[in-house]
Amino acid sequence: PALLAQNASEFNFSVGARIYNDGNQGQGNVSLRATVTNPAGNLVYDNSVSGLNISSVDSADVYPTGNFTLADFSLASYPAGTYTLTYTASLDSLDEYASDNSISYTFTISESIYSAAKIDTATGLPSGKTFYRPSTNNQTFSICSAINNPNASRLAVEGLYFAATKGIVVPEDSLMAGEEMNLTLYKWEDVFADL
């Protein structure tokens, strides 16, 4: 939520990637560019690193303590909305399959919602369209999301959203009517020692 991202000291993250060379030729002087656009579509982060040499069927890493690094993403303020982080790899030579040289991710700063799920930009609510569960789910299944933030005292829980799914081998199996759901919210009062 925006209350946890008031300025650069409260919200920032390391930027990095692993670049793969699936081709049969080594690649010299590969560069990686990372950009972030804000909710208005303006470029607010643009950094790159070059000089990566990647052998055939190998990879190279760009990360904070490695040989190749990108600056952390950090802004003076964070307007609410959806941001887009894009990584683009470039080569000095002809790339016979350039369509996999770029990948984008989005993240949302919401006015009031903390979510591990993707946020629907039209409604501002968590999107219940992607589900994760054990492949053989013959017991109860639970998931935990912990908030460890020095500014979490600014927040108060006013409600919980959840989504659920069932198998659809038989169309009627997907109906949730009559199913029991148990939502539990715990307050962790012990010291976070190793999270």
Residue spans of the language-model regions?
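Short, acidic/polar linear motifs in exposed loop/turn regions
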Residues: 21-25, 40, 151, 166-168
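Conserved aromatic beta-strand anchor motif in extracellular beta-sandwich/beta-rich domains
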Residues: 32-38, 183-187
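Enriched for extracellular/lumenal, surface-exposed ectodomains of secreted and cell-surface proteins
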Residues: 35-37, 79, 83-99
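Short acidic/proline- and small/hydrophobic-mixed sequence motifs that coincide with surface turns
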Residues: 24-29, 44, 155-157, 178
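Hydrophobic beta-strand positions in extracellular immunoglobulin-like domains
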Residues: 18-20, 36, 89, 162
